[in-house]
């Protein structure tokens, strides 16, 4: 009986961190560019990461749903939500997200480290009618606001793109740019 209790206790001690949610907060102490504060919450049980960028009216939040392969970003200034497929070759896995953020923060690299990977998306001007196909997390975040689908532009560069883009930079790991008419207004 004592063995069972000890075993259950040890199992709980070692299993709890693997299934728990964790939060990572990164403050931009040198807030010259007005990047504000970012926080990442990861729910390993549901395979979802939530990134919040708090910078006044230029704030946004993003959900990366690793379970269904979609991500959504809600742009508060534009009052829109943009959904796109996750490029798993560029975006960090949910397992490595914690390690990447801690490495950047603890080593003090921040914006001075290696350049972030970049993704560029073209936003379809037609509104999405059915949010349920993207999963309940994305549907809940985007419910009640205009939502658009975006397609990744392969081999694209902001340097050569002449249209208007809105760029979200996630913890110096990945820059995601949304380009098209819906981000101009």
UniProtKB/Swiss-Prot annotation:
Cellular component aspect of the GO annotation: extracellular region; extracellular space; Golgi apparatus; secretory granule
InterPro entries per the UniProt record, alphabetical = BRICHOS_dom, Gastrokine
For this UniProt record, give its keywords in alphabetical order, as a comma-separated list.
Disulfide bond, Golgi apparatus, Mitogen, Secreted, Signal
The answer to keyword Disulfide bond applying to this record is yes
What's the main place this protein lives? Answer: secreted
- For the keyword Secreted, the answer is yes
Q: Which GO terms describe its molecular function?
A: growth factor activity
Q: Where is the BRICHOS domain?
A: 54-150
An example GO biological process term is: regulation of cell population proliferation
Where is the signal peptide, in residue numbers? 1-20
PANTHER family, sorted: GASTROKINE 1
Q: Which family does the record assign?
A: Belongs to the gastrokine family.
Record's protein name: Gastrokine-1
Q: What organism is listed for this UniProt entry? A: Homo sapiens
